[in-house]
């Protein structure tokens, strides 16, 4: 069951990590200018989580109605989350909303390749925060993975200069760069914070509960961005922006908006799902290894240059990915193969022929 969840979360995280930045950049390069609106879309797809939550609720209710179930008289809860976990999820959600704005601001003015490069630096900080917050244990394989991925991202930086879009001013480029750096640092803190929340929760953390946590986090993040949209007046100009969109007009615009919200939801759900199934470091490693893949898609979709350094970075990232998960496989195998202590047998007592 756990292996299946890991595979599912890896797939949806892959789709979200690669697709989210590309769709967001597509919006900004074709007439879209609403940064708060894009921040809103990053988590606005949370209602789709209600589908698996409904399935989980119906399954629990069916189980409680089973006459063989000792707890069949207890009323089935619609939500499993208790108040302390609810409050913690809101706080993390507000931080996520802020992170969404910072990242969307960066994507508005930076090429996908550059923003991916900057976001990739979160791995080193993710490892640091994981060590400080949840006492993450490092193995030679995980250390090797962090070093390889960090070096790969550093190689990408060799040709990051000179990629400023022609339509952007120097000030916009620099501010976008700094915003993306802060976004990387903040999300590197958020992932271990989610793992710490799991560990400190006073209730059993199950995958349905993880879905509830994700929904509350996204609801809080979306509310944060809605306030920003009201302040800057985004709601008043969306219809006009749709009509003036350069590709496909209003129909394509609204289709892009819906798909972007769904894809980004996959990113966040996959990220915290891997934190649940493995660790925050594992989630950070997978996100980092997918960044060069996003670079390749950016080259194809936006005709960004693909220098030799990007190819080397891609190979190093794949090497780091294999190194990390090979180490996890070996650690798991050692636990399985560890000899169990023999059962203690009671001594055989002599049977006396004497009958009282």
Curated annotation (Swiss-Prot):
Residues 35-158 form the EamA domain. The chain crosses the membrane at residues 4-24, 35-55, 78-98, 114-134, 138-158, 174-194, 213-233, 256-276, 282-302, 311-331. Pfam families: PUNUT. One of its GO terms (cellular component) is plasma membrane. It comes from the Eukaryota. Keywords: Cell membrane, Membrane, Transmembrane, Transmembrane helix, Transport. This is Purine permease 1. It comes from Arabidopsis thaliana.
């Amino acid at each position: 069951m756990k292996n299946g969840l890991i595979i599912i979360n890896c797939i949806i995280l892959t789709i979200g990590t690669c697709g989210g930045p590309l769709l967001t950049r597509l919006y900004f390069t074709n007439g879209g200018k609403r940064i708060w609106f894009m921040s809103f879309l990053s988590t606005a797809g949370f209602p789709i989580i209600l589908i698996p939550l409904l399935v989980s609720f119906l399954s629990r209710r069916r189980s409680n109605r089973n006459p063989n179930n000792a707890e069949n008289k207890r009323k089935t809860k619609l939500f499993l989350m208790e108040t302390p976990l609810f409050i913690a999820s809101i706080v993390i959600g507000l931080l996520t909303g802020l992170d969404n704005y910072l990242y969307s601001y960066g994507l508005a003015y930076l090429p996908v390749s550059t923003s991916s490069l900057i976001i990739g630096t979160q791995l080193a900080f993710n490892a640091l925060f994981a060590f400080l917050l949840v006492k993450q244990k490092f193995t030679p394989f995980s250390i090797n993975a962090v070093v390889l991925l960090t070096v790969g991202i550093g190689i990408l930086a060799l040709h990051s200069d000179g990629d400023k879009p022609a339509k952007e001013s120097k000030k916009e480029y620099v501010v976008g760069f700094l915003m993306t750096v802060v976004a990387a640092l903040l999300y590197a803190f958020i992932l271990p914070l989610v793992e710490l929340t799991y560990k400190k929760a006073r209730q059993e953390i199950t995958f349905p509960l993880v879905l509830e946590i994700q929904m509350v986090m996204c609801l809080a993040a979306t509310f944060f961005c809605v306030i920003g949209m009201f302040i800057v007046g985004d709601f008043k100009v969306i219809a006009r922006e749709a009509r003036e969109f350069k590709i496909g007009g209003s129909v394509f615009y609204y289709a892009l908006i819906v798909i972007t919200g769904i894809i980004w939801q996959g990113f966040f759900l996959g990220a915290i799902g891997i934190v649940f199934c493995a660790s925050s470091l594992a989630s950070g490693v997978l996100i980092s290894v997918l960044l060069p893949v996003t670079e390749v898609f950016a080259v194809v979709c936006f005709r960004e240059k693909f220098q030799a350094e990007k190819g080397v970075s891609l190979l190093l990232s794949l090497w780091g990915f294999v190194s990390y998960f090979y180490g996890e496989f070996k650690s798991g195998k050692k636990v399985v193969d560890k000899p169990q202590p023999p059962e203690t047998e009671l001594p055989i007592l002599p049977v006396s022929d004497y009958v009282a």
